[in-house]
């Protein structure tokens, strides 16, 4: 494998690692968003339950305080993950550009090498054709003379 091929392989590996990191961040953010939705639903459910009993009415304010604190922490975590996700997306874009740069260089190198070999082959065939033509002329002149 050429040096450019190795660079493509290494940078592709790095790109895949960055994509996996990004996917992990996106999954975690989605989980936190689902947790937030679940918390909101639980809050509504507890609010409905609290109106039906005295014990619920007494315990509900403590539950609300804890739920609001949890919601605040979830929102902060989601915001931080959104920032980290955007940074990871930028890293993936940059890594992708690197891979494309090295793939293009590798492809150009391979094309130039194929062209060089094709030119060498054409020259060899031209030389062979010229030699055969000269031999044919010599044999014709010997047979005529």
Map each language-model feature to its residues.
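Charge-rich amphipathic alpha-helical interaction elements
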Residues: 1-145
